[in-house]
Amino acid sequence: RQRQMCIRDRRCVGGVKRSELVSVSTVAAAVTVGWIYDRDHHLSVIIMLVVLLAFFSAIEKGGEVKFSQIMAGTGGSLFIGWSFASFLRLEASGIHRAYLLLPFILSFACDTFAFFAGLTLGKHKLAPKVSPKKTIEGSAGGLLGNVLCGLLFVWVMDRFFGGSAIGYGPMALLALLCGVVAQVGDLSFSLIKREFGIKDYGRLFLAHGGVLDRFDSVLFVAPVLEIIFSFL
């Protein structure tokens, strides 16, 4: 159903219909997640399948797709699959399932606080050539909001779930780090959209864009949290 909704969007990205890119990316991401879920597969085989799929799509279109687009799509697809698979790896680590919400909390909180801080206090542009509406004040507000939400998460875990795996001090630093990473992820996907001259990655969420528009920061934050929690 999601693919059908994506196919409705026929605008082009770099000369390639978005539905074609979404089709390749969806399959590639699914295969990547499948590899991480089933350790019997080998990464080299998965990469080869993704590359072959990308080239097959290019050949089918009679050379309309450039080699650089194939490589960008392939790399992006593997990154998306690997990032989302962080949730599977986190769950497999035995950590409390409540922590699976943390990548979303430390991404959406930063985005929300940054929006309102920028709306009320924003004066100095953060990256005008990439995202003209983002401001330094908004960025600082997002980081502060992330720290507050991270501390609130620790309090909730201590109060209702028998204790937190991470203390208040380390969580403050972790939330600050994730806030920076979330903003880098947001700007990175904004840069890609500007590069290809598109406004949104899809229409799944109507006016709010597609999956990547809503979860761009999560893709960057989830692997960071996975790495941090692997040392706990």
Label each PLM-derived region with a short phrase:
Residues 47-58:
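A generic, well-ordered mixed alpha/beta core segment in the N-terminal half of proteins
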Residues 8-12, 34-35:
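Canonical alpha-helical transmembrane segments
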Residues 10-22, 40-41, 56-220:
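Interhelical loop and helix-boundary elements at the membrane-water interface
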Residues 25-33:
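Hydrophobic, membrane-inserted alpha-helices
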Residues 2-7:
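Short, small-residue-biased leader/transition segments that mark boundaries at the very start
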Residues 35-43, 232:
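Transmembrane helix interruption/hinge and helix-loop junction motifs
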Residues 226-232:
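Juxtamembrane boundary at the C-terminal end of a transmembrane helix
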